[in-house]
Structures are given as structure tokens and as C-alpha cells.
Swiss-Prot record:
It comes from the Viruses. This is Putative gene 53 protein. It comes from Bacillus phage SP01.
Length: 221
């Protein structure tokens, strides 16, 4: 099996902001067929993520002098190639999340997850699937005190009684004609998404080079 990753790196020296996307192929010689990934235990997937993360860290350290592992913002799994069959989207999502946790460390887990949370949530429409996703990503939570039914009921109630998140973002924009950097703060909601806001800026000659979520409010219906 071969996994292909896009590793996003951001750095700033106070005067200048730099962004880089590093492309890397990480081969896994122990897995040959897509069906082999279906029967993998959580421990085995975790070990696989650790192996991939170590490979990424070594490659970044050995390639750049100005960028370091601490500058990694997110590792995106572009594709997985096996000798036979295609791996599932669920496996790709889980592996991507675990690799980011390994690369960025436990203190940066929330930053890692926030960048893929919206797209991941869209793929898990049932309470059962979303409960499994939460269990994979949460740390230091004791699930023995709660049954799966309790978790499903709680998530079902939350999905019925709450509206989409209204978030505040800090955007670093660059004028594509002059190269001037401008920092702006915007708010998003279900009617005004971040993509639509960025699209308007792009129409006026400004491209986003960095975005950071400042806060969010989950409003009850």
C-alpha cells in the first residue's frame, strides 16, 4: 500500500508570512489489499498512523532548513493505492485524524481536528457513525460509565435542538496584484459560509493565505 500526503506548513518571522505544501509518498509494505484495512483493530490503525507520522517528520526535518515539524498545520491524505480494491472513506478519515494527532502532538489535536471537522461531520449523518467518530477523536474520556445507547440519545437530541455553528475567523489576505498582506476578521453562519466569503474576496483580487478560527457560538433552536 502507498499513501500520498499533502503536508501544509506555515511560518512567520514577524515581518513575513510563508506557506508551503510538501508532497510525500509513504509506502506501507505490510498491507497489500484494501480488504486488509477493514479488519484492522483500533490499535493496529494507531500503529499504522504512528509509522506514517514518523516518516513524515523525518522527511520534513531532512528536506528543509527554514521550515520545521513545528510549522506543520495539517497533513491531508490525498489518496491510497493498494494492489487490489479501494480503501473506504471511513478508513481514510480515521487515518488522517490519527496521523495529525501523532505529528502535531496531543496539545495540537484540537487545531488539527478543527480544519477537517466540517467535512468529516458531513459524512456521518447517523448518530451511530458520529458516536464512533467522537470516540476515535476524544482523548482522556471514560466511556465505561455510559452505554452506547446513552451516547446515541445525547447526540440525537443535540442534532435536533441546535442550529449550525456561527463562527468568527481571522483571515490573512494577500492582494494578488501588489502582494500586500491584510488581516481581516469575518463571521460565518449557515447562510454566509467561509467559502462564499473567500469567493467574494477573490473576485476583488484578494486571496486567502491563512485562516484561523477565533471562536464559535452554537445557538439553540
Amino acid at each position: 500500500m502507498r499513501t500520498y500526503w499533502n503536508v501544509s506548513l506555515d511560518r512567520s518571522n514577524g515581518k513575513r508570512f510563508e506557506r508551503l505544501v510538501h508532497y510525500i509518498c509513504v509506502p506501507i509494505i505490510s498491507i497489500h489489499h484494501a480488504e486488509d484495512t477493514i479488519s484492522m483493530t483500533r490499535k493496529e490503525v494507531g500503529h499504522l498512523a504512528e509509522t506514517i507520522a514518523n516518516h513524515i517528520i523525518l522527511d520534513i526535518n531532512g528536506t528543509y532548513r527554514t521550515f520545521s515539524v513545528n510549522d506543520i498545520v495539517h497533513c491531508s491524505l490525498e489518496k491510497v493505492i493498494t494492489l487490489e480494491g479501494d480503501v473506504t472513506n471511513e478508513f481514510i478519515d480515521r487515518l488522517q485524524i490519527l496521523v495529525n494527532k501523532e505529528v502535531q502532538g496531543s496539545q495540537s489535536t484540537q487545531q488539527s481536528l478543527s480544519s477537517v471537522f466540517e467535512s468529516t461531520l458531513e459524512k456521518y449523518n447517523s448518530p451511530d457513525d458520529f458516536a464512533d467518530y467522537l470516540e476515535e477523536t476524544e482523548e482522556e474520556v471514560d466511556y465505561e460509565d455510559y452505554s452506547l445507547d446513552d451516547t446515541i440519545d445525547a447526540i440525537s437530541y443535540a442534532l435536533k435542538t441546535q442550529e449550525p455553528v456561527q463562527a468568527e475567523w481571522c483571515l490573512l489576505m494577500v492582494d494578488v496584484y501588489t502582494g500586500t498582506l491584510t488581516e481581516v476578521t469575518v463571521e460565518t453562519d449557515k447562510d454566509k459560509t467561509l467559502d462564499s466569503i473567500l469567493g467574494k474576496y477573490l473576485e476583488n483580487g484578494f486571496e486567502c493565505v491563512s485562516k484561523k478560527r477565533l471562536g464559535e457560538v452554537l445557538r439553540s433552536a
